């Protein structure tokens, strides 16, 4: 019997190059998602998110191009509670400043969609995406579209009765961004390094790494709560809050559990101590990776992860002490993305060996010629 491949990329050189090309494209997309999260942080911190009051996925790509168009957009903004209660008297030039960040945030999201979709179609047509990988990539594209809808769902919450967006919807929007970013990295790493070298004590370190990533995710969600209800301004000292570890005003709302989600003092308290616990778990993971004699790459990633963890804690404290200075707060969100990426990389290096397959990840499954009938 002989094998016959349906893939145009079946030649040895193209089949070897295809995974790398697809992986590089996915890493570019992950980098764009990273930049998107940074732009989103600036948009939120400058209170620019409600400056565009309509959702026009196609025609909204262009900003106002004439004075009349600017005045029309400004008039729409003047109808919402944020302007009427908090920004009354804002000039047109000031409005243009906040409009820029929200417009850039939305434009960058559109660009990510284009940069993902067009190469995806190109790789697929050329046979460089396997049947196993195609649904994963299609799912990532759909997640990106869902993220755009979630963004508008979040903005909508601040256009009628509120002067800001729902912090629950903000957390959903931020969490989805981190999920897409982590998924892009995971798939890219799987293509670049489909069979990482076995690591000593990987079976013990893997649950530890998953626990660290889960804790980081919960800490990020509470960070979004802190941002959404301006809890970062409640107490700007460290480690005490108003001279005590746990201020009494943490428990002023009923039912009691609601304080953990909506009370500014309690939300900041939870984020602070979740961050401490997460940092300790991550640093413990890094120490264990070194102590068990992991390979050079695992040790290198663990060292970077430890350094990034210490830096992130420092950025969080500095953000508090600076009363949420925008450059520091933006860097703090970037630090969370770096930690996420390094933990995804760590988990990739710790993953169990896979059963060998007959087909390579990015080539079509070979067909077997049927014997001619006698």
Curated annotation (Swiss-Prot):
Q: Which cofactor does it need?
A: heme b
Q: Which reaction does it catalyse?
A: Fe(II)-heme o + 2 A + H2O = Fe(II)-heme a + 2 AH2
Q: What is its EC number?
A: 1.17.99.9
Q: Cite the annotated pathway.
A: Porphyrin-containing compound metabolism; heme A biosynthesis; heme A from heme O: step 1/1
Q: Which GO terms describe its cellular component?
A: plasma membrane
Q: Which residues form a coiled coil?
A: none
UniProt binding sites for heme: 271, 332
Membrane-spanning intervals of the chain: 22-42, 107-127, 135-155, 172-192, 209-229, 265-285, 306-326, 327-347
The GO biological-process annotations, alphabetized, read as: heme A biosynthetic process
Q: Which UniProt keywords apply?
A: Cell membrane, Heme biosynthesis, Iron, Membrane, Metal-binding, Oxidoreductase, Transmembrane, Transmembrane helix
Q: List the disulfide bonds.
A: none
Q: Report how it sits in the membrane.
A: Multi-pass membrane protein
InterPro entries hit by this protein = COX15/CtaA_fam, HemeA_Synthase_type2
Which molecular function GO terms apply here?
metal ion binding; oxidoreductase activity, acting on NAD(P)H, heme protein as acceptor
Give the location in the cell.
Answer: Cell membrane
What family name appears in the similarity comment? Belongs to the COX15/CtaA family. Type 2 subfamily.
Subunit details: Interacts with CtaB.
Read off the HAMAP family from this record.
HemeA_synth_type2
- Please explain the role this protein plays, according to its UniProt record: Catalyzes the conversion of heme O to heme A by two successive hydroxylations of the methyl group at C8. The first hydroxylation forms heme I, the second hydroxylation results in an unstable dihydroxymethyl group, which spontaneously dehydrates, resulting in the formyl group of heme A.
Provide the protein name. Heme A synthase
Q: Which organism is it from?
A: Rhodospirillum centenum (strain ATCC 51521 / SW)
